[in-house]
């Protein structure tokens, strides 16, 4: 069901639909936005991983497991 076929589109909806997809400037702008978002998500993921790693390190330090795994004990 297309809103423009019903005559219910606003001027903003029509403007959005009129964006040429082969415009090099629009493609460059979209690429920058996407790269920025991917960087944001990667930094967020890495930050979350560091918190998990710190928690695991603390648990390992508090454990009472004996022996040194490097020596095969």
UniProtKB/Swiss-Prot annotation:
It comes from the Eukaryota. Keywords: Calmodulin-binding, Phosphoprotein. Residues 47-73 are annotated as: Disordered. Residues 47-59 have a biased composition (Basic and acidic residues). GO terms for molecular function: calmodulin binding. Residues 26-55 form the IQ domain. PROSITE patterns: IQ. The modification Phosphoserine is found at residue 36. Disulfide bonds: none annotated. It holds the Pfam family IQ. Belongs to the neurogranin family. Acts as a 'third messenger' substrate of protein kinase C-mediated molecular cascades during synaptic development and remodeling. Binds to calmodulin in the absence of calcium. This is Neurogranin. It comes from Serinus canaria. The gene is NRGN.
């Amino acid at each position: 069901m297309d809103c423009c076929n019903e005559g219910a589109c606003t001027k903003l909806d029509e403007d959005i639909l009129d964006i040429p997809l082969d415009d090099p400037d629009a493609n460059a702008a979209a690429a920058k936005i996407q790269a920025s978002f991917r960087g944001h998500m990667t930094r967020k993921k890495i930050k979350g991983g560091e918190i998990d790693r710190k928690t695991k390190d603390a648990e390992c330090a508090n454990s009472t497991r004996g022996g040194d795994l490097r020596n095969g004990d």
